[in-house]
Amino acid sequence: MRHGGSFARHTLVPARALMPVPDALSDEAAAALPCPGLTAWQALAKLPHLHGEALLITGAGSSVGRFAVQLALQKGARVFASASPRHHQWLKQLGVQGVADYRDPDWLAQLQAANGGEPFEGIIDLVSSQQAEALLPALGYYGHMVTVLGRIARNPLPAFSHCHSLHEIALGAQHAFGSDKQWSRLVAAGVAMMAQMASGELTLPPLVVGDFDALPALLTRVKQEGQGEKYLVRVG
């Protein structure tokens, strides 16, 4: 959204931004998808080739990371991920080829070793622009760096060397700058993801649902305790 009213009981949105919800999907599940799920979809759409490619996803335990990992694996990418230990078993069960604890000083070296010492063809960074910039040397020639939290202001590597492509993601900016064609693609992606959620092909992050009066407490929990859960409030 590009204006106030995120916590309003009713709000107006353009018809082109609406998605039908399958009957098999709960209201809570439907509400938990668009922001993290479509952000992940946009991030992966920046990568021209995924099948067989080595893709590093940092912050893979976040709600966006959870969707990004699943969608990348569906497209045949060889995924490597950094996340807190509580997410490691789930990531390995999905088929992630290398998992490391981001708090370990050697986490990047561990994932590079898991990739046979080869550079990554793509990196999706869900942590910070500073980390993304620091990861550029781990990206191979003609590789793609996708940042979700901030942008790399200036490529620190020499020109005409690694020839990296730098991408930034801002789902909310589509409300101001997206064309009808882009909205049609985004909504189609959301509809397909909802169908996969209804069939069990895609899984949601853990949901924490509270009544509207609990909103201040839930916002505090997001800031202090967020570990990949998706926080929702019932408005009504």
Task: State each model region's role.
Residues 158-208:
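C-terminal substrate-binding/catalytic core of Rossmann-like NAD(P)-dependent dehydrogenases/reductases
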